[in-house]
Amino acid sequence: MSSTPTAEELALQNTVSQSASAHPELYHTVSHASNNSYQLPQLSRSATSNFSTSARFAARYPTTAGESFQNLTPVNSNPSNQNSKTEPNPDDVEKCIQDPLLQVFPVVEEPERFVFSIDPKSPLIAVNWPFKRKLKTTCILAYVALCSSFASSVFAVPAEAITTVFHISLTVSLLTMTVFLLGYCSGPIIWAPLSELSGRKPPILIGMLGFGIFNISVAVGKDIQTIMMCRFFAGFFASAPLTVVAAALADMYSNKYRGTAITLFSAMVFDGPLVSPIVGGFLTKSYLGWRWTEYITSFMGFFALIIVYLFCDETYSKAIIQGKAKEYRAITGNYFVHAKSEEEVLTLSDIAKNYLLVPMKLLFTEPICFLITLYSSFVYAILYLLLEAYPIIFGEKRHFSMGVAELPYIGLLVGVFIGSGINIAFEPWYYRKCLAQGGKPDPEARLPPMMIGCFMFPAGIFWLSWSGHYSYVNWVVPALSGLATGCGILLIFLQCINYLIDAYLFRAASAIAANTIMRSAMAAGFPLFAVQMFHNMGVGWAGSLLGFIATALIPMPFVFFFFGRKIRRMSKMAVDF
């Protein structure tokens, strides 16, 4: 008694019929249990069985654009009987491979290994995504970076409040910011290699989960030891997005738009530390108290975890290909399908040599990475030093109350936005330079905005120092210095990051990790001596000392602009297109 064919059987029959019409010499008719006739290849029983699974997969899950399998050397399931097997006709096998039905798995006597690959122009690759998808992912990643940087200085104002709660000195209380930044310093050693092994998304998810948990722990901490320890681990997990986000943006954007995307990331890196002291000051002064600075930070982290998990896509091409190969294995049950990168057999020694130690190797053996990182680290550390200097200038000298004393940070914030605008306006010029050399990145063409910033940065510091030194000078004057200082900091830091990405394009995550390690170490130390330096030397001369150092670093972008290409040619790890 015959039964009505199912929709799956009809789809399979239709697909096979089309294939049989294309290659009738390879097929013969067999009867199915439901008395429906099917055209199957003229192969052995075992091959026909293997084909059945492949055919059903091809009918239900056709290969999408840009996906393909590359045939490797056959691996016999029973090598001892290899000589007794009938070898398939190579011409027939080639026809089967070309057949739309059999393009998923070539049908041969023995199982084979297949390398799953994706065409570089496939829409699966992040750089080929539609603009809306890129914009969505970029906004999510920017928010994650903002959460991380927000937490770094949100404890700057509460640090003074906890001196009376836990009966500690001001210097000890300032360690709450230092240990967080030391966590920043240690985290990239783990997150950068992990992002190159497993993709960009897993480190961010793990980082935001740990970030939220340890910020809650700080909020409920009963003693200073608990707070210090939890702040360190919060910084360790918070360093994940700072290490990975820039590399993820490099995955998504070509030379034309990468600089604009990195501008958004850099703005978030600086906006967080400038906004959080204002929030922290008013929260600490309110009935909520200093603990709510950490509650709010943890809520931000958990929200970031949710939106990254639900809406953020993986951007690393190697991880995307591995994920698709895993999906095909699960659907077809053929565990010979794999990505090329999965053929690598990594030992602990290989992981340490090729991944864990790469950031340190870049930092201490590559002059480009070391000098560029040194400059960006100095301006980044000055930002955290100013978080301690502003309360002296506006709180102690001008008697602003808590919260209000932090409002002049808005000047720095506006300066950061001005610097971002300058960089975005510069991007078309950079893109034309890239087109002039065949569309390849030109790291030295990134540096003209830094040449502007290297003058604005020391000018802003001198402006703040001597206008802030005299209490009779209206507070607006030193507050406006933040326009020059913030703009200079952003232009220098941003182009340093862009230069590292372009110069070490295939090691971008490791280069950013090296940068994060050094700049976090310097930022951790600067606030510890800021208060004593500004008290003992006076605001004018303490600031001038920093201004003189910034002035001495002015030649840095000019040296790399004129000699950077020659230096890169001598490098073992930098790219030279």
Curated annotation (Swiss-Prot):
Pfam families named in the record: MFS_1
GO function terms (MF aspect): spermidine transmembrane transporter activity; spermine transmembrane transporter activity; transmembrane transporter activity
Record carries keyword Acetylation: no
TM regions (residue ranges): 139-159, 174-194, 204-224, 232-252, 262-282, 292-312, 367-387, 402-422, 447-467, 473-493, 504-526, 543-563
Region listing for Disordered, in residue ranges: 1-24, 68-93
Keywords attached to this entry: Endoplasmic reticulum, Membrane, Transmembrane, Transmembrane helix, Transport
GO biological process: spermidine transmembrane transport; spermine transmembrane transport; transmembrane transport
Subcellular location: Endoplasmic reticulum; Membrane
Compositionally skewed regions (Polar residues) per UniProt: 1-21, 68-87
Annotated GO CC locations: endoplasmic reticulum; plasma membrane
Membrane topology label: Multi-pass membrane protein
Major subcellular site: endoplasmic reticulum
Keyword Endoplasmic reticulum appears in the UniProt entry: yes
Sequence similarity: Belongs to the major facilitator superfamily. CAR1 family.
The protein's name: Uncharacterized transporter C36.02c
Lineage, uppermost ranks: Eukaryota, Fungi, Dikarya, Ascomycota, Taphrinomycotina
